[in-house]
UniProtKB/Swiss-Prot annotation:
Basic residues bias spans: 175-185
Name this polypeptide is given: EF-hand and coiled-coil domain-containing protein 1
Species whose genome carries this gene: Homo sapiens (Human)
Biased composition (Acidic residues): 394-404
Gene transcribed to yield this protein: EFCC1
Biased composition (Basic and acidic residues): 343-359
Coiled coil regions in record: 196-303, 479-533
Positions of the UniProt region annotated as Disordered: 1-22, 96-127, 175-198, 326-411
Length: 598
């Protein structure tokens, strides 16, 4: 193999402008092959011997080694780095063709040199060659890669002989692989040429084997050259990036340091926000736990109150029965007996008996009091009759009667008071009033008490008339103590009614709250079975709590509203939409320690 011309090598080195040293031969093989293919180099140089499988296969191997990703596309930066390694500048006019022309200028005439200078000075051709390399897309396919390189040398080659590409390729391959040599006439077979012919045949076989070996070595050398060219491109890119970084100097280092400090500050800020968020989550979880504990404590209190409800209900029923009994006894007073003086006595007895002890029935006392009152009135009538018949009594009896009236003036006034109280009584009088009345009637049983008995008869008649007109519709209590006691019982009854109503309302509210808690626990159990992440569950809880921290909500939200919103947020989870709804038996089988049995 012959060394390449020094002029071509110097031209290539000058055109490349390579910032680092590279081997003198290996990176120029592709340029020589392209220049020879497009007629820019008139001789077969040493670099052309690597063209074992053709130019297209050579370019494909180079593209394959440059495309390290295996995507079938070459980035624009890699293509520009390849052009820089090969010495092809889109902004320059120095090419491999010029280098080859400078190397061969010593073998041409002055006229040919002038023609070549005129051709090289053609600005249109240079502009087309530069545009062939400069107008590339962001990523190049193999077809575009092949078109860019071949187009660059095709615009520089100028007019060529009218030969087809296939015939030219075949002629080049024949000239490279089997160079022309002088043919010798075959030896005529002779009687003594047997060993020579065998030796010639053996040598020809060895030559063919060596030729095949050389072809294999050429193919391997071509692949190695493509790999070396790809490594040169990578080295060029790394040194170019290092060179660009070195241009900045301390300013670039300071800028990178500031960027690193900014990134560190941003990371610390994010970490701080995350810590604050975690603290907020813990605080809200603690608040939710306290709310649940308070609700549980309240539920237990309500359970204790609910246990007292049956006793209160029995008490209320007893009071209602007692009140109903009083009303029924008032309505069952007989109308014909109102003309007798007994109703006053009857009305004086049962009230006190019912006030003192509601359990015993007052019918027996009522009958006994009525019988005693009637007997006392009969005795009074008899005494009055005897006193009327004995008008001619002695003066001594009259004096004694006057003295007795003076002594008993106060009891007579008290009897009048009792009768007046009886006339204004709206209910039955107590036993004490009835006993006092019977006592005074017993004292007035003598014949000397005619005047007082007359007053009593007049008062009783007036009382009967009032009872007839009013129909015993209204009556007052015997004493202020009894009235206060009855009023206190009425107030206690009303208070118990209100308390019972409040307990019932609270029980209903807690039952609703319990149902919502059970629904929320069921949804949480289903989400736990679906392996929901803690982050997503915490996000749902925080979003629900944040919704009630909105200033638009007036006052403090109720636990029922919070549970309702949490139930809706959990029900809207994507995991529950993907899975079928759980059967009703699963909801019934859920055990909850917060359940209240009312």
């Amino acid at each position: 193999m012959e060394p390449v011309s020094t002029g071509a090598e110097a031209g290539m080195e000058g055109a490349g402008g390579d910032p680092y040293r590279r081997p003198a031969r290996r990176t120029q093989w592709l340029l020589s092959a392209l220049a020879h293919h497009y007629g820019l180099d008139r001789g077969v140089e040493n670099e052309i011997v690597v063209l074992a499988t053709g130019l297209d296969q050579y370019l494909q191997e180079v593209f394959h080694h440059l495309d390290c990703r295996g995507a079938g596309r070459l980035p624009r930066a890699d293509f520009r780095a390849l052009c820089a390694v090969l010495g092809l500048r889109a902004e320059g006019a120095t090419t491999a063709g010029q280098a080859a022309g400078d190397g061969n200028s010593r073998d041409v005439t002055p006229g040919d040199a002038a023609a070549e200078l005129a051709t090289d000075g053609d600005s249109d051709t240079d502009e087309e060659a530069r545009l062939a390399l400069r107008a590339e897309p962001p990523e190049l396919t193999f077809r575009q890669f092949h078109a860019r390189l071949c187009g660059y040398f095709g615009t520089r080659a100028g007019p060529r002989l009218p030969r087809g590409a296939l015939s030219e390729h075949i002629e080049t391959q024949i000239r490279l692989r089997r160079p022309r040599r002088r043919r010798r006439p075959p030896c005529a077979p002779g009687p003594d040429s047997g060993p020579d012919c065998e030796r010639v045949a053996r040598l020809e076989e060895e030559n063919s084997s060596l030729r095949e070996l050389v072809e294999d070595l050429r193919a391997a050398l071509q692949s190695s050259d493509a790999r070396c060219l790809a490594l040169q491109v990578g080295l060029w890119k790394s040194q170019a990036s290092t060179h660009e970084m070195g241009h900045g100097g301390p300013e670039a280092a300071v800028r990178e340091l500031r960027q690193a400090q900014g990134a560190l500050a941003a990371a610390e800020a994010r970490a701080g926000r995350l810590r604050r968020g975690q603290a907020e989550v813990r605080r809200r979880a603690e608040e939710a736990r306290q709310v649940v504990l308070r609700s549980l404590h309240r539920v237990r209190e309500l359970e204790a109150l609910a246990q007292q409800v049956p006793g209160l209900q029995r008490w209320v029923r007893r009071l209602e029965a007692e009140l109903q009994r009083y009303r029924s006894e008032d309505s069952q007073l007989p109308t014909p007996q109102l003309a007798n003086p007994e109703p006053g006595d009857k009305s004086n007895e049962p009230e006190d008996a019912g006030t003192r002890d509601p359990d015993p029935t007052p019918e027996g006392a009522w009958q006994s009091d009525s019988s005693s009152g009637s007997r006392a009135l009969d005795e009074v009538d008899e005494q009055l009759f005897r006193s009327v018949e004995g008008q001619a009594a002695s003066d001594e009896e009259e004096v004694e009667e006057e003295r007795w009236q003076e002594e008993k003036k106060t009891p007579a006034a008290e009897a009048k008071t009792l009768l007046a109280r009886l006339s204004s009584c709206r209910g039955r009088c107590d036993d004490q009033t009835a006993e006092k009345l019977m006592t005074y009637f017993g004292h007035f049983g003598g014949a000397n008490h005619a005047h007082t008995l007359g007053e009593l008869e007049a008062c009783i008649a007036m009382l009967v008339e009032q009872l007839r007109t009013q129909g015993c519709g209204g009556r007052t209590l015997g004493t202020s103590e009894e009235e206060a006691e009855l009023q206190q019982k009425v107030e206690e009854n009303e208070h118990l009614r209100l308390e019972l109503q409040m307990v019932e309302t609270e029980r209903v509210r807690l039952s609703l709250l319990e149902e919502k808690l059970v629904d929320v626990l069921q949804l949480l159990q289903r989400l736990r079975d679906l392996n929901i992440s803690k982050r997503a569950l915490g996000k749902i809880l925080l979003s629900t709590l944040d919704a009630f921290r909105d200033p638009t909500h007036e006052g403090r939200p109720s636990p029922a509203a919070i549970l309702d919103a949490l139930h809706q947020a959990l029900a809207a989870c994507q995991l529950l939409r993907r899975q079928p709804s759980a059967p009703a038996s699963a909801a019934a089988a859920l055990t909850n320690p917060l359940l209240v049995s009312c």
